Amino acid sequence: MKFIDFPTPKGLTVTVNTDQVCQIFHDHSLTDAPALLDFASGEPQGVTDSVADAGKRLGIPLAELDGFSPTGSQIGTVLVVPAQVTFVRETEPGRPDAGSLIHLGNGRTRAVTQSRKDAVDRIMAAAAKDPDA
């Protein structure tokens, strides 16, 4: 299991579990041009024209994309392929000590942690207990 960090346009950092699949990220001010990211490789796979276009490129109908949009979030909307995407995001810019552990496998589970390291440790511990989780 490997985690990578990437900055967002609003100055936050998102830490992603690269064992998981694909995610479409866009800032609220750029809803017509989300970035399509493939976290299996950890490299951006290109910018799409829209969320629907991103789903089309992934071969997934828009209706089957799971969504998560934290209230008041500064990082915008995250749309994920419904297949366990686990990531950690800072709750405030420049505050990596204030992280949230968010598991988007069901689009709902969310737990606030003490830090991004703490969140990563929790993910690793959960994976060790249940490799299929």
What label would you give each PLM region?
Residues M1-A133:
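Eukaryotic intrinsically disordered, low-complexity regulatory linkers and tails enriched in Ser/Thr/Pro
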